[in-house]
Swiss-Prot record:
Monomer and homodimer. Gene3D superfamilies: 2.40.160.20, OmpA-like domain (3.30.1330.60). GO terms for cellular component: cell outer membrane; pore complex. The gene is ompA. The chain crosses the membrane at residues 1-8, 13-21, 48-57, 62-69, 88-96. Residues 107-114 are annotated as: 4 X 2 AA tandem repeats of A-P. The record marks R65 as: Part of salt bridge gating mechanism. Disulfide bonds join C217-C229. It is found in: Cell outer membrane. Belongs to the outer membrane OOP (TC 1.B.6) superfamily. OmpA family. The lineage of its organism: Bacteria, Pseudomonadati, Pseudomonadota, Gammaproteobacteria, Enterobacterales. InterPro entries: Bact_OuterMem_StrucFunc (IPR050330), OMP/PagP_b-brl (IPR011250), OMP_bac (IPR006664), OmpA (IPR002368), OmpA-like (IPR006665), OMPA-like_CS (IPR006690), OmpA-like_sf (IPR036737), OmpA-like_TM_dom (IPR000498). This is Outer membrane protein A. Residues 116-243 form the OmpA-like domain. Sequence repeats lie at residues 107-108, 109-110, 111-112, 113-114.
């Protein structure tokens, strides 16, 4: 019984040593010329075993080795008449079971990128502002307070807010563009004062683009009635993008 200790020289070549012991039994038979009888003796014992060699892996399963083994003091000179040492030089082939190619390691699939969700809120400009004005009314501030309570869960590291201001078609394009920008900025300034990070919110004026009334007010001529008819176009839309 021996223990094998190996050291790799290359991927395919190892040197090794084996250390242990061997249980042996030695038998002798001698002929007595005087009596004409044969004498038989035997002895048993344990002797140390030392071995060293090189092993070359031809394949993962098959290897060849060259080894020298030495066993010390086999037998008892008083019992069997001799106590030799034993040396053995051997060349052999070994087969290792279960050494097939390892299954390729499959890297885990990367986690999917977090889905960016966009939420939309629409506020009536007539609630936020007086007609043709960009200063928030008390009712408008109350409406934004309610909106902020919904936005307060937004993580500023992972989201952004865009405020879009819209006007109706009454007035020139340039005037309406400027009014929509001022109204959007008023909403942004108020939400920043409530706690939305300034670098996570922006204002954009859309002028009289994208009217929601379509052509439903084309036949309305009286100004007051037209203002009422176009009220849905006067709005502030808020886009919240967050993960």
């Amino acid at each position: 019984l021996t223990a094998k200790l190996g050291y790799p020289i290359t991927d395919d070549l190892d040197i090794y040593t084996r250390l242990g012991g061997m249980v042996w039994r030695a038998d002798t038979k001698a002929h007595n010329n005087v009596t004409g009888e044969s004498e038989k003796n035997h002895d048993t014992g344990v002797s140390p075993v030392f071995a060293g060699g090189v092993e070359w892996a031809i394949t993962p399963e098959i290897a060849t080795r060259l080894e020298y083994q030495w066993t010390n003091n086999i037998g008892d000179a008083n019992t069997i008449g001799t106590r030799p040492d034993n040396g053995l030089l051997s060349l052999g082939v070994s087969y290792r079971f279960g050494q097939g190619e390892a299954a390729p390691v499959v890297a885990p699939a990367p986690a999917p990128a977090p889905e960016v969700q966009t939420k939309h809120f629409t506020l009536k400009s007539d609630v936020l502002f007086n007609f043709n004005k960009a200063t928030l009314k008390p009712e408008g501030q109350a409406a934004l307070d309610q909106l902020y309570s919904q936005l307060s869960n937004l993580d500023p590291k992972d989201g952004s807010v865009v405020v879009l201001g819209y006007t109706d078609r009454i007035g020139s394009d340039a005037y309406n563009q400027g009014l929509s920008e001022r109204r959007a900025q008023s909403v942004v300034d108020y939400l920043i004062s409530k706690g939305i990070p300034a670098d996570k919110i922006s204002a954009r004026g859309m002028g009289e683009s994208n009217p929601v009334t379509g052509n439903t007010c084309d036949n309305v001529k009286q100004r007051a009635a037209l203002i009422d008819c176009l009220a849905p176009d006067r709005r502030v839309e808020i886009e919240v993008k967050g993960i």
